[in-house]
């Protein structure tokens, strides 16, 4: 898409340069014409004229009254050299031989008589012509015509820019025009079938589609379709895709624009663009206006420090006016907006009559994730061992964009190994890469560091296996990825929407298992548990201040109002005293201390299993759920896994050789090796579940 735009932008720049060069050439030529005519005449003063007459150097003289002066022209008997000047210093001055002269004198009787006497005494032919007013106009035109030419060329240039750049894109003279991209709904290929994992959300939008197709049915019943639909939810859940599907199903014009496109540095531009957008939508009604990231323009007015009457607020005011009652005579314009920050939107924007319907587009459940995976796997050849349902169960909290990224990473891994199909191992690697980044198998680690990491992860696994409300341990690995040295993936047997206090307490104990695995075996503590401590502290504080799970403090909310604007809570006092703050800290420490003791008891009671899992991690690097359970119960690996060996990490040259093994001509092929060097910028650890622990 970008490649298609580059030639247009190149031609656009070339056209501008052509117009500028043409304007300069015309102005320069016009001035050169006048200056060349003027430079062919020797301009002299009255005293010089009298000297040349007395010196018998003049052939003839002509006197012509002009305004308040008399123009004296004539010819020399012999050409004289004069230094010419032009209006463009860069061209420099030049000298030339001229035969004509010109002088301006004051029309007094004495001056005229002196010239006549000098001409008569030297036999110089003297003639007088009638006064002419054309000289003044020629001089005026010499200044006006170049200016008019320049303005005309500039106007044509601006018109060409407007024709190519559209209403608000390339034309500087139309800042107030909307930058919305219009798409014909009849040619849109996106349908509700392309949106998976959002069945309830699609059902909410079916009425909007039906109204756009059959408005009479609703008008006859006196029903009013929602003037606006607000799609809110985390990034990557498919809000924009849902809006496109509505336009595709309804078959009406679709105007899409980002909230940031309304506001510019010039005053009044945002409000003007809002008016222009709705005027265009009304002309093609019924139609849909989609505003992506509406929080960029719809934030609360007067919020935070310096929240005065700025340009963004003027744009919001105009948007509020346009959205209030523009459905008349069946010509409906429906506004669909998307945001992941609905908490910062202005209340006037959310009231009934503007955004009547609010659709929460959240992360899909296991059934929805499986449906999303099936949609994204349509164009990917999957091997027979790939179970998309199993992949869906291992990706809680993943949204549509994350799931698409997992399959894409798996396809890249398979392509790197010259496979024809994507197998389960590729999917597993794709999940690891999407969550924690590429593996760093050739990272230099001492044996002691590897042992500490292995016992750390084994500690997480043991606590998760022992506790009743703990999640099922699905995977443990000590392969470094990004900034982490390893991780343990624990998932619940079924998705829990409302975890109990027992679930949270067991989760805290599982988070403590990593640090205890280091302390019990080696008697040391490493920074690898910093992420565990951070998450555990957040959960414990939420239990005390938000969930009311502390018997000492009771069911009281202490930190429920989190302001998002700078300065909004400045000067506001806390709703609890200093003594209560001390009690909150004491309760958080107590809950974390109890979790620490429970985790310590679980590991010390199962020291043999802890050691068996850690040694298996040092040997095999990665263990799945079946292997972990076998080690916990029998202390041994399953038979089919006992013979497996950990492959040595390949060098970049070896990977390049394998990738090019079946390629005849690879001179223009770039091979990407995701596991090549440890000094590459590590990817951030992507936390997908409260039960995942990463160090």
UniProtKB/Swiss-Prot annotation:
Topology Extracellular: residue spans: 37-139
Alphabetical UniProt keywords: ATP-binding, Cell membrane, Hydrolase, Membrane, Metal-binding, Metalloprotease, Nucleotide-binding, Protease, Transmembrane, Transmembrane helix, Zinc
Residue ranges annotated as Cytoplasmic topological domain: 1-15, 161-695
E.C. number: 3.4.24.-
Keyword Protein biosynthesis tagged: no
Residues binding ATP: 233-240
Location of region: Disordered: 657-695
TM helices/strands, residue ranges: 16-36, 140-160
Known cofactor(s): Zn(2+)
Cellular component, GO annotation: plasma membrane
Pfam families hit by this protein: AAA, AAA_lid_3, FtsH_ext, Peptidase_M41
Gene3D superfamilies xref list: 1.10.8.60, P-loop containing nucleotide triphosphate hydrolases (3.40.50.300), Peptidase M41 (1.20.58.760)
Main localisation: membrane
HAMAP family for the chain: FtsH (MF_01458)
Oligomeric form and interacting partners: Homohexamer.
Protein name: ATP-dependent zinc metalloprotease FtsH
Species in which this protein is naturally found: Lactococcus lactis subsp. lactis (strain IL1403) (Streptococcus lactis)
Lineage, highest ranks first: Bacteria, Bacillati, Bacillota, Bacilli, Lactobacillales
